């Protein structure tokens, strides 16, 4: 089995839109949770979310890519730009040996909601021909592959909250068995919309706290649900010997991955 290392990382997050910004904010204890600003909240039990702020996709992407993409794909492309740039794999790895595994729990939900509203208001003939390509759950992976000319395996995993971890783990396995030399992998989400917040809120999954510092409390007896967030995280994984041979900076090594299902309930964990 091949050894697998990390040679690039990039992110768009509620506390920073680059790895450097994110790291500094994380170590400083910055909280990315605040009152939802994207829409009015007259009937919502949940009023807080972790929104991406001060985000300028034009700093990394051209206007055409931005115009044709849902926000979740834009986040993914920007994070991938940073990760791939850091890794230096373009021109150093055969394009046929570069794969993309970028997943999303829901996909282009902003596009889904806006085009549904457009159809109800203006009729079916006014639905954008870009609706389906912008909305589908594999378009972030596909767009990333096109953007970098990556011609290896391209798969979009969807495993709810575990999506990014699944994509990274499966990318690790792909390199382990020799299916690729390098993998651009991770996940992206952009679902802070009225419908998504209402849906998660009404299933009592979201925190109803009004204090941002007391809203997200995992593994705490005071916990009351999760806080909706958004953004993207992307890694470049590479076969160890190849990374060493080209003098790449190695950030970390992936040494294991596994996945199971308790086959118990859609949302509740197995109590045993």
Where are these regions (language model features)?
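Condensing-enzyme catalytic core mediating Claisen C-C bond formation in acyl metabolism
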Residues: 3-7, 27, 32-34, 211-272
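Active-site-adjacent elements of ketosynthase-type condensing enzymes
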Residues: 41-51, 107-111, 190-216, 258-272
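Conserved beta-ketoacyl condensing-enzyme motif
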Residues: 6, 21-23, 27-159, 188-197
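Generic N-terminal segment detector
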Residues: 1-15, 22
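Active-site-proximal alpha-helical scaffold in enzymes
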Residues: 76-88, 140-141, 145-189, 227-248
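Active-site pocket-shaping loop/turn-to-helix segments
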Residues: 11-16, 62-81, 127-136, 154-169, ...
